Amino acid sequence: MFHRIEEALEDLKKGKVVIVCDDENRENEGDFIALAEYITPETINFMITHGRGLVCVPITEGYAERLQLEPMVSHNTDSHHTAFTVSIDHVSTTTGISAHERATTIQELLNPASKGADFNRPGHIFPLIAKEGGVLRRAGHTEAAVDLAKLCGAEPAGVICEIINEDGTMARVPDLIECAKQFDIKMITIEDLIAYRRHHETLVTREVEITLPTDFGTFHAIGYSNSLDTKEHIALVKGDISTGEPVLVRVHSECLTGDVFGSHRCDCGPQLHAALAQIEREGKGVLLYMRQEGRGIGLLNKLRAYKLQEEGFDTVEANEKLGFPADLRDYGIGAQILKDLGLQSLRLLTNNPRKIAGLQGYDLEVIERVPLQMPAKEENKSYLQTKVNKLGHLLNL
């Protein structure tokens, strides 16, 4: 149904249009996307004839600064915070609306000699400023267009147009599939673009290494930063893990209430301590401590979820009521850290099959799942049962 990212890149380099779909829980839309560097009046005409949406030009912050493109509004209330600048027409155009003149405006926007004064405001081309970090920071068509341009080695700017059906409704995936077939266009998803970038780019940096004596033994502690956000992660390494043999690994998501305060609402603290003790006993292994508090929703939202649980919601329902998925964690950064440590084959300490799938999706081999079950407490029996029933955790309760 969808094409590989590599196939889309090849077509884009040839000046062709591709269709890019976002998540069904986001806009659930498809856009025509082309590279701004190769834009022609014919491509613009195709987009406005068969896409029927608004023609926009995703650009980097650098273009906006050079051309003095101010935000369209001072207070952006768009649900997805799409970063429209003031609309523009090049001064050489007349009305600016024809396919030819829109293409001219886009071509001049990319001209390194162009200045802010070379464009009339408002106009018929709508620049959008992509977030630094692209789809890894914001999973929108704006960022997808700029990322695709960069991956093609082209100027970091694209041309996009939403695809609307003939009856005026938004085209969804079944409609987009028919459109792609009709015009022989490659179709990809932003989700696949995110995965492609995570696989092909190094996003973590080894920052500092120390010796860390603990109650469970002495570990080699390595601190990591990553280019996606400000979160810092730490790997506690025991023994020689460079032998090529499968290594005992625990990927532990931060839980301040459980790890530090000993909360009985969860089993996180006991799992952390048990994992460290088991790695120490084996004399070799890694505990990767990921700053993904509350299955990725953050400390305050976790406390809000606890409040909802006190009102009768279970842990999954509470997350969803707050507007989050049941589990927001992503294992791409963790996988890159494990690869930086030289690991390929793991014996994974976990009760969570999704964690196994998440790591294996980044070319790490999990040859064994090592159970890490803690005795249930009265306060967390219901929580653990929900993890079994709704999240698929492998626990014997």
From Swiss-Prot:
Binding site for GTP: 250-254, 271, 293-295, 315, 350, 355
Gene Ontology CC entries for this record: cytosol
GO biological process: riboflavin biosynthetic process
Keyword Nucleotide-binding annotated: yes
Binding of Zn(2+), residues: 255, 266, 268
Residues engaged in binding D-ribulose 5-phosphate: 26-27, 31, 138-142, 162
Cofactor: Mg(2+); Mn(2+); Zn(2+)
Positions of Mg(2+) 1 binding: 27
Region (DHBP synthase): 1-199
Location of region: GTP cyclohydrolase II: 200-397
Residues where Mg(2+) 2 binds: 27, 141
Transmembrane parts of this sequence: none
Enzyme Commission code(s) on record: 4.1.99.12, 3.5.4.25
GO terms of molecular function: 3,4-dihydroxy-2-butanone-4-phosphate synthase activity; GTP binding; GTP cyclohydrolase II activity; magnesium ion binding; manganese ion binding; zinc ion binding
Active-site residue numbers: 327, 329
Pfam families associated with the record: DHBP_synthase (PF00926), GTP_cyclohydro2 (PF00925)
Record family assignment: In the N-terminal section; belongs to the DHBP synthase family. In the C-terminal section; belongs to the GTP cyclohydrolase II family.
PANTHER family: 3,4-DIHYDROXY-2-BUTANONE 4-PHOSPHATE SYNTHASE, GTP CYCLOHYDROLASE II-RELATED
Purpose of the protein: Catalyzes the conversion of D-ribulose 5-phosphate to formate and 3,4-dihydroxy-2-butanone 4-phosphate.
Record's protein name: Riboflavin biosynthesis protein RibBA
Organism: Bacillus cereus (strain B4264)
Taxonomic placement: Bacteria, Bacillati, Bacillota, Bacilli, Bacillales
